[in-house]
C-alpha cells in the first residue's frame, strides 16, 4: 500500500484500471487430462464448499494465502501462488498437499521459477 500511495495520480489510475481489467479473471477453471483445476492468485478467503467461484469477490482470491493443510476441493486441484514455497516448507520447490499445488518458488525474491504442468503433474525449474 505504501508503494501505491507514492505513485502520482495518473499512475494510481493506471493501477486501478489494471485491477478492474483483471477482476473478471480473478480465478480460472481448467480441465486438463481429465483433471479439474482451479487457478487463483493466493487462496480463497472465507471459503465455503457450497459457494460457487463466481460468488466470491476478486479480493477473496488475492488477499489471503491458501491453507495447504486444508482440502478445498475433493474433485478439483487448487493451484495457488502469492506465498513463496520457502515459507511453506517447500525449500523453493513446488508444494503439493491436500489437493493443493503451491507454485510460487520465490522467483521474485531471488528464488527459482517453478513450472507445473497441469497435464501430467511434472515440474521444471529455471
Please place each PLM-identified region on the residue numbering.
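Acidic, His/Gly-enriched loop-helix segments that form or flank divalent-metal centers
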Residues: 1-102, 106-111, 122-125
